[in-house]
Structure formats: C-alpha cells, structure tokens
A protein has these predicted regions:
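Structure-specific DNA junction-binding interface
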Residues: 1-80, 87-98, 105-119, 123-198, ...
C-alpha cells in the first residue's frame, strides 16, 4: 500500500538550521555553544568562506552532523590528522572512522561536500571544447584527484571537435602504482566513438614528475590507440598543487 504523505509531517531543516532532535533525550544545547554557532554562521553569511580559517569552515560542516555537542575538538582532530580542509573532505571513509567518536553522520556530511565540489567542477568541462575550457579542466582534475591518498587513472574521451564526451575512471591502485591496460583503453575509445583521449592520473606524493613506468604506459597506450585511428592528445599527472602535461614537457 502506498503511504499517503500528510502536509502536517515535519519538513527537512534549512541548511542553516539545527538538525531536529528529541530535546527530551538530547538535552538543551549549552548557550555558549549556541552563541558560537550563531557567530560563525553570521560571519560566513557576511564574509563568505574567505573570512574563515579551515577549522571554522569545518565546524560549519560538522554542525548539522553533531547538533548537540561542541564540534571544535572534532574539527581540530580532523585537521591534525589530514592537514587541511581539502584533505579532510577527500579522506577515505575508513580513515575518517579512525578519529575517536566520529561516526557515519559526519562522514556523510563530508562526502556530500566532496561530491558537490566534484560535480560543480565537472559540469564546467563536460560537453565543452577542451582547448577553450583548459583551465576549467585542470581545476576539475585537481578537485577530483589532487588530494587522493592512492593513485587513480582517468580517461577523458573527446570527439572529432575535441569536445569532452565522457570522463571515466579506468582504475584505482596503491600509493605509487595503478594498473592500466592499453588494449582496454583503446577498446573503450571505440565503444564511445571517441576520436581522441587525454589520460589523467594523480601522484599521492604530490610530485607530478613522471616515473619511467608512467612514460612506458603512455607510449603503450599511444601505440594501441594509433592502430585504431585514435589520437592521444596528452597525459596529465596531477600533484598536490601543480600538474605536469606530457605534451608541454616534450614526452609526447
């Protein structure tokens, strides 16, 4: 039987509201915590994120997940463990659970922020000409990959007009290796009717300098694609704060 929704049912909380809780069981939020939260929210609304250090921005994210406690210790613990706001947001769930007292509610909030950032960056490059949107493409790659703790290999598929038609994760690996199979890359290009590719992978160490293995796999993929009439435009290695282009560096 389909449940009829009543207009008297409680609505979801607005983004700046507290998450509803049962006051009988949770108790009243101490005034000093409530005042602190109001001040942070007011400062965010007035000055935006630029007016706030990482630990305060992280507190704002944690407010909804931890509605009845002081979140400052959690924010500090997360930053002490991972270094900065970006690394906290992109940290793997198992490592986030290593923080004492931090549960799924917090992890979900953090991962929602990460997913939103990636979707916004991706929307700026999909179905766009890669040359005219090159900076946006680099921003997307950094948003999606720069703070990962393991290597990820992505392939950007382009049509004849160099418009990005697909962005796919090919493989995930360890901290310094990711398995890639040139024939599978070329096969997928044919399936998507792609005319060109851009390879992208990250270096968790933060240094985008290509290894010998990086150069070897690039040549192998280029050879596999050439037999099918598919062009390899570039291979980007994403570091923590910069990237390396095989094309610009003379490797292609």
């Amino acid at each position: 039987m389909v449940k009829e929704i009543s207009f008297s049912e409680p609505t979801l909380p607005f983004v700046l509201d507290e998450v509803p809780t049962n006051s009988a069981t949770s108790g009243k939020l101490p005034s000093y915590i409530a005042d602190h939260r109001r001040r942070l929210r007011a400062r965010f609304m007035t000055g935006g994120p630029a007016a706030m250090p990482d630990y305060e921005l992280l507190e704002l994210v944690l407010f909804r997940a931890i509605p009845r406690k002081d979140v400052k210790p959690f924010a500090r613990a997360l930053l002490d463990r991972f270094g900065d706001f970006n690394r906290v947001i992109s940290a793997p769930a198992p490592r986030l659970r290593d923080i004492p007292g931090l549960g799924d509610a917090v992890i979900i909030e953090l991962k929602i922020i990460e997913a939103a950032a990636q979707r916004m960056a991706r929307a700026k490059v999909m179905q766009r000409h890669v040359v005219s949107s090159w900076e946006a493409l680099l921003d997307y790659c950094h948003t999606a990959m720069a703070h990962r703790e393991t290597e990820q290999f992505r392939i950007l598929f382009l049509d004849r007009k160099n418009v990005l038609i697909a962005d796919e994760e090919q493989a995930q690996g360890t901290v310094d290796h990711v398995p890639v199979y040139p024939r599978e890359v070329a096969k997928r290009a044919l399936e998507l009717n792609a005319s060109a590719l851009i390879l992208v992978h990250n270096h968790p160490s933060g240094d985008p300098t290509p290894s010998q293995a990086d150069r070897d796999i690039t040549r192998q993929i280029q050879a596999a694609c050439e037999t099918l009439g598919v062009t390899l435009h570039d291979h980007l290695i994403i570091g923590k704060s910069e990237e390396l282009s095989f094309r610009s560096a003379g490797y292609l």
